[in-house]
Amino acid sequence: GMGRLKMSERPKTLTEKQAVAAVGQVALTHLYQNLFSEYNKIIAQFLLTKADFSDRNRYLNARNVSLNLLKKGIIPVVNENDAVVADEIKVGDNDTLSALVAGLIDADLLIILSDIEGLYNKNPQKYDDAKLIKLVGKIDEDIKKMAGMEGSKFGTGGMYTKIIAAEMATKIGTNLVIASGGEPENIGKII
């Protein structure tokens, strides 16, 4: 929304953030609609909130709608409904949201795209000798530290949120792959 509104600074108040998010959501959906139409695919905008995962009736409704869309060959473009949620009731990040949606639809596989190839044993932007961890058997505190937790109690995004999403997804039986989004052929290789 900031780009569409030609804003140079992030909004400060919750109401301003929500208004900008509402503008941005339309632009984002339009972009996805144009991209998927090149492949003769129909999309549906599907905005969710934390309440959709914590209230049983809302959860079942979201599940039924999602599965119905998929059955019809329609691609649900899922995002958090930032125009109506406050910070304290947010899912929080798209990695977590993707793991929740994977559970919602009983997905076999969740692919999370990143700006790097995956989890490294240390930050590859700081250390030349960083090595890609190709397979993680179990997510423990050491893995979380590798992901950027750095001994703190809270992650702020990046690889840490992807590892937390991986932990959530694998607990419900969904396989998860973290791959570079800069290489479109990765998705085909993974599938």
Regions found by a protein language model. Give the residues of each.
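Active-site loop ensemble at the mouth of alpha/beta enzyme cores that anchors a bound cofactor
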Residues: 185-191
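Nucleotide/pyrophosphate-binding catalytic subdomain
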Residues: 1-171, 175, 181-183
